[in-house]
């Protein structure tokens, strides 16, 4: 009982400490001007990481220190962005949305804490609103909810077409964006610590390989999100696969399997309500058996192609929102992982140095100390003195200096 009382008291003290908290140096909404991001009137570069688990761990007040540790370690290395989930759907442990329109307040307060702590420490957040994959609910859960209400649905991709499911998604958007943070007392849609929303993690629609179904969904949902929240940037959460609008790129750059997923990098980002382009580089997932030289050559072609198209066709910034090299990749070595990071960062820096469209890169993924249950093949602990962390820190330093030089 004494322990419980202490935890409750501690939570109250922490909550009170956020009210009227001074703005961190990074405070202010991130906007864009052409192919560059702008923060407080000056160019801003997105150096960062993925940590999907932040709200999950923050749901328990006794493990919130992990979020604090990660954010503090990140800022000490010069990192500026964390990309994380704003969803956890269905009958799962610590679900955020337990049923359409029904939310677990304790889990929502976990997300509140993540945002408040990011604001206090000086990290900007990119928050995703749903998952393409079944993990943590995803579009499959939305389809299951609709089926349980008598809707006739035959595929998980009915997520994009069924009007009831689309209303479920819109209601989730409204609930999250209008949420008033219990720590800061600021609505999410008014919170500068949030850099951007992404419509979905890795949107795909395999039942319509033409890309029309996914395109129609983005055309509907992107303006809807903007109607609820005009303050924040918005992107798709796209992997970067080319579609029929770019047949040459589709044939020369896409992994063969990507030609059937109904996504279109150019068309899906070439609408006014989408502020910046998103791409991933899953070379270890798409081409597991490549030798290192071939892998690095693909990364170079993939990144440079998207950067060029963001610059010349979309005329918007592009963020590499996921990249890395998993330890389960055949012939994996730490040196090979370092090579992937170095090659990736060099290409991003070369564009940014010229004022180009490459606005930053977010590696997959960060975990905190003592999180072996969350550790995956690509997990990195920032407090480790690994060679990869040194590469991350050096790139952040260079991009930070570039930002300072640009601001003069």
From Swiss-Prot:
Major enzyme class: hydrolase
Catalytic residues of the enzyme: 202 (proton donor), 322 (nucleophile)
Recorded family membership: Belongs to the glycosyl hydrolase 5 (cellulase A) family.
Recorded superkingdom: Eukaryota
Main location: secreted
Glycosylation sites: 73
Organism ancestry: Eukaryota, Viridiplantae, Streptophyta, Embryophyta, Tracheophyta
Stated name of the protein: Putative mannan endo-1,4-beta-mannosidase 4
Catalysed reactions listed for this entry: Random hydrolysis of (1->4)-beta-D-mannosidic linkages in mannans, galactomannans and glucomannans
Positions contributing to substrate binding: 85, 201, 364
An example Gene Ontology molecular-function term: mannan endo-1,4-beta-mannosidase activity
Swiss-Prot/TrEMBL keywords: Glycoprotein, Glycosidase, Hydrolase, Secreted, Signal
Gene Ontology BP, a term: polysaccharide catabolic process
Gene: MAN4
Signal peptide span: 1-23
EC numbers for this chain: 3.2.1.78
Cellular component GO terms, alphabetical: extracellular region
Subcellular location: Secreted
